[in-house]
Amino acid sequence: MVLMIVSGRSGSGKSVALRALEDMGFYCVDNLPVVLLPQLANTLAERNSSAAVSIDVRNMPESPEVFEYAMTQLPDSFSPQLLFLDADRNTLIRRYSDTRRLHPLSSKNLSLESAIDEESDLLEPLRSRADLIIDTSEMSVHELAEMLRTRLLGKRERELTMVFESFGFKHGIPIDADYVFDVRFLPNPHWDPKLRPMTGLDKPVASFLDRHTEVHNFIYQTRSYLEQWLPMLETNNRSYLTVAIGCTGGKHRSVYVAEQLADYFRSRGKNVQSRHRTLEKRKQ
């Protein structure tokens, strides 16, 4: 397991790095006092979970020996790594001007420039110990997150999770949907008394819908649309793509179509989840 310690000058991108690490599966803690690192590591060792902890000038120990001692108290199952983010002085000044935030050392009645310089001196012990130093001066938020994934996971893109969910329009459109497709125009199994009690997960309903050309055409055109834009969506720094398929009640057509799309992209090696809102409500 990895204990990633994220440090760096204020404004260099520590919050961005912590969010990216969280997306990679790290248990993240912002501004944990150094003396509590062993306690956190021991707790997470029981869960077999890697962790990322940010340390900045606000929770730096007064003596470097405190940090070194904390490192010696980590359980053997953890491999500590220190990531230090930095940026040039002018970039940090510009970022603070853009966000209009106060520097952590501004409470000492220092000017922004003086606060940045003093912070550099205070963080030098960590910088000199860093396993990886990243200069974010010319990086966007997305580029920093991408670099971390490349360095830590050995691949450029994070794995996008495609979520196909069915719903009923009479219950409302899901607010988490990135795309919403309406299948109320497709033949409706509801009007067949034998199929009405069933759902789109049942074979008789699937056979009914499978007999109709318009159902095949809709599924083909929808998956083709998603395939065309999926490469760009995968590089757009997102973790999930939620595709909602809606019919009137969310029981037959939308369930079947959502499952067909999920099976198709799953067979193409994508990370896929499927859920059925109306069916989940019926189980409650």
UniProtKB/Swiss-Prot annotation:
Segments for region (RNA-binding): 266-284
InterPro entries in alphabetical order: P-loop_NTPase (IPR027417), RapZ-like (IPR005337), RapZ-like_N (IPR053930), RapZ_C (IPR053931)
GO molecular function: ATP binding; GTP binding; RNA binding
Residue sites binding ATP per the record: 8-15
Record: residues binding GTP: 56-59
Pfam families hit by this protein: PapZ_C, RapZ-like_N
Record keywords: ATP-binding, GTP-binding, Nucleotide-binding, RNA-binding
Domain of life, source organism: Bacteria
Disulfide-bond pairs as recorded: none
Family from the record: Belongs to the RapZ-like family. RapZ subfamily.
Function, as annotated: Modulates the synthesis of GlmS, by affecting the processing and stability of the regulatory small RNA GlmZ. When glucosamine-6-phosphate (GlcN6P) concentrations are high in the cell, RapZ binds GlmZ and targets it to cleavage by RNase E. Consequently, GlmZ is inactivated and unable to activate GlmS synthesis. Under low GlcN6P concentrations, RapZ is sequestered and inactivated by an other regulatory small RNA, GlmY, preventing GlmZ degradation and leading to synthesis of GlmS.
PANTHER family on file: RNASE ADAPTER PROTEIN RAPZ
UniProt subunit comment: Homotrimer.
Name of the protein this chain belongs to: RNase adapter protein RapZ
